[in-house]
From Swiss-Prot:
It comes from Mycobacterium leprae (strain TN). Belongs to the enolase family. (2R)-2-phosphoglycerate binds at Q162, K335, R364, S365, K386. The active site is at E204, K335. One of its GO terms (biological process) is glycolytic process. Its cofactor is Mg(2+). It is an enzyme of class 4 (lyase). The gene is eno. This is Enolase.
Length: 429
């Protein structure tokens, strides 16, 4: 029986130079596993609370309190438990914390332990993590949703939309999809240079030029797709993450591209984009608290494009259930650190799939070399992963892990491709 023997933790740095938590678990059979916790830049109000120190170290962003929570409180509770009992262990963590938002021990402390336990159990069983979580039928490789042009909170520019993504839906395999995305990425750099625009990078490895607005950015990405030799829509589609909570003011509206808009006006804006660009997915088009606006937007354009709920759902089964009942969105963005345990993440995905919602597994802007989400997306058969541009090692680490998984699966591997968005695929611009 793979009993937990030791639990350790330390403060490490994420890709933005901010501290985060790393947890190590050792089992009685000698198995060792490590998990590092990511952190977001545009964080929703309903996410699990990260425990930060608030002192003079790292501008108050140190995580020694979370590390101490692992060492002093969580470790003694989980030591002696069977690492295979993931649900039991995660429930012990929730009970120990005792708050609805994990604010006592910190979602960063709790998640680190939850993920490290799962990794250790998989290693003890001599199974790859995707197989341990997903079972023998896990075989779907995801479409990489590559954020190749950054705006919003991910870049120091006036571009309001946070992410402009390319989705290589026409590729025959993941290895080819990765190549296509990388070639478009490099083509975009050339396009930007020719136009005298900056090729500096944002938090997630995408370029962060100062451009006039959303349509100008989409035009640049479309030019890059064509310059790389691909057909916009049929080969490589487009996707957005508006992160609209970031430009919404309660009681005033959406301050977007120099004007104040209502939810209905934002919906009209997105509808116009759908008529001009091969968009297959729009994430967080409205604010996290604008339930009525979301429902109206989904009713208006939800048959034409995937509408992904991130901040509004926060990977929380209870919020997702409310959204399903109100006709909000048709897809769930999945971020393990939003909810804080592996078990709750799996519950949210199961609810989404059971309700006909698609899922997209996502990184955070503050990432580490941890590749867990690459295994998770295959385990869950989500068919979509968002983990940044094909640049910067904390992003590429996930893509490289997916290459290994595809190779390990061999002939059993299937690339999701346009099936991930079939009802929304647009052949031409």
């Amino acid at each position: 029986m793979p009993v937990i023997e030791q639990v350790g933790a330390r403060e490490i740095l994420d890709s933005r130079g901010n501290p985060t938590v790393e947890v190590e678990v050792v089992l009685i059979d000698g198995t060792f596993a490590r998990a590092a916790v990511p952190s977001g830049a545009s964080t929703g109000e309903y996410e699990a609370v990260e425990l930060r120190d608030g002192d003079g170290r790292y501008g108050g962003k140190g995580v020694k309190r979370a590390v101490d929570a692992v060492l002093d409180e969580i470790g003694p509770v989980v030591i002696g438990l069977n690492a295979n009992d993931q649900r039991l262990i995660d429930q012990e963590l929730l009970d120990l914390d005792g708050t609805p938002d994990k604010s006592r021990l910190g979602g960063n402390a709790i998640l680190g332990v939850s993920l490290a336990v799962a990794k250790a159990a998989a290693d003890s069983a001599e199974l790859p993590l995707f197989r341990y979580i997903g079972g023998s039928n896990a075989h779907i490789l995801p479409v990489p949703m590559m954020n190749i042009l950054n705006g919003g909170a991910h870049a120091d520019t006036a571009v309001d939309v946070q992410e402009f993504m390319v989705a290589p839906i026409g590729a025959p395999s993941f290895v080819e999809a990765l190549r296509w995305g990388a070639e478009v990425y490099h083509a975009l750099k050339s396009v930007l240079k020719k136009k005298g625009l900056s090729t500096g990078l944002g938090d997630e490895g995408g370029f962060a030029p100062e451009v006039a607005g959303t349509t100008a950015a989409l035009d640049l990405v479309t030019l890059a797709i064509e310059a790389a030799g691909f057909k916009p829509g049929a080969d490589v589609a487009l996707a957005l993450d508006a992160a609209a909570t970031e430009f919404y003011t309660d009681g005033i509206g959406y301050h977007f591209e120099g004007m104040t808009h209502t939810a209905d006006q934002m919906t009209e804006f997105y509808a116009d984009l759908l008529g001009s660009y091969p968009l297959v997915s729009i994430e967080d088009p409205l604010s996290e608290d604008d339930w009525d606006g979301w429902a109206a937007l989904t009713a208006s354009i939800g048959e034409q494009v995937q509408i992904v709920g991130d901040d509004i759902f926060a990977t929380n089964p209870e919020r997702l259930e409310e959204g399903i009942g109100r006709g909000v969105a048709n897809a769930l963005l999945v971020k393990v650190n939003q909810i804080g345990t592996l078990t709750e993440t799996l519950e949210a995905v199961a609810l989404a799939h059971h309700s006909g919602y698609r899922t997209m597994i996502s990184h955070r802007s503050g990432e580490t070399e941890d590749t867990m989400i690459a295994d998770l997306v295959v385990a869950l058969g989500s068919g979509q992963i968002k983990t940044g541009a094909p640049a910067r090692s904390e992003r590429v680490a996930k893509y490289n892990q997916l290459l290994r998984i595809e190779e390990e699966l061999g002939d059993a591997a299937r690339y999701a491709g346009d099936l991930a968005f079939l009802r929304y695929v647009v052949e031409t611009r």
